[in-house]
Swiss-Prot record:
Chief location bin: nucleus
Native source species: Drosophila melanogaster
Name under which the protein is recorded: Enhancer of split m3 protein
Annotated Polar residues bias: 205-215
Domain of life according to the entry: Eukaryota
PROSITE patterns: BHLH, ORANGE
Region (Disordered): 205-224
The record's note on its domains: Has a particular type of basic domain (presence of a helix-interrupting proline) that binds to the N-box (CACNAG), rather than the canonical E-box (CANNTG). The C-terminal WRPW motif is a transcriptional repression domain necessary for the interaction with Groucho, a transcriptional corepressor recruited to specific target DNA by Hairy-related proteins.
GO biological process: cell differentiation; nervous system development; Notch signaling pathway; positive regulation of neuroblast proliferation; regulation of DNA-templated transcription; regulation of neurogenesis
Keywords: Coiled coil, Developmental protein, Differentiation, DNA-binding, Neurogenesis, Notch signaling pathway, Nucleus, Transcription, Transcription regulation
Name of the gene encoding the protein in the UniProt record: E(spl)m3-HLH
One GO term describing the cellular component: nucleus
Limits of the Orange domain: 98-130
Amino acid sequence: MVMEMSKTYQYRKVMKPLLERKRRARINKCLDDLKDLMVECLQQEGEHVTRLEKADILELTVDHMRKLKQRGGLSLQGVVAGVGSPPTSTSTAHVESFRSGYVHAADQITQVLLQTQQTDEIGRKIMKFLSTRLIELQTQLLQQQQQQQQHQQQQIPQSSGRLAFPLLGGYGPAAAAAAISYSSFLTSKDELIDVTSVDGNALSETASVSSQESGASEPVWRPW
């Protein structure tokens, strides 16, 4: 028993310094990587730092993360509310990126539903939800672009005659009207509406015709 305790004690006595050195090496490596990242970020902001202590690295990192958190909060607030301060090009780009990803995901869901043997009530509800949310995103993006355009017009001289920066997207009322037609959901698989992704920054809007009867037809939105 004494021999076993002695071996355990000796093992801990030897391993503890080794583990401590490994832990310190990991900390130092992370601090070095963090220093390189912070120096690069500061240089992008116009600040030049030649030497940083470990405490300085941690302080700068905390400040930088707080700034990122505030910016992210403002962007999220603009996405959710869609009102308040004029949206920046960054927040508008975030909304556009999310909308494009949503359209792509909705297209994949549509393809799966179209491949099913029959269209049930659940499928129609899913398609209705997707189209309603897509129209909301489209309206939200248009509102933010209008606010951004008004804000830019106030910031530049009236004699310039054009905006300093082009707006993202390029969507107009016609696209919103085309999106609204997407909410007209019917009762058969052939009448389910396909949502496709956007090509570039513009949403192509076209109307296609589908019918259950030989003489009946109604427009649906197929943006490809």
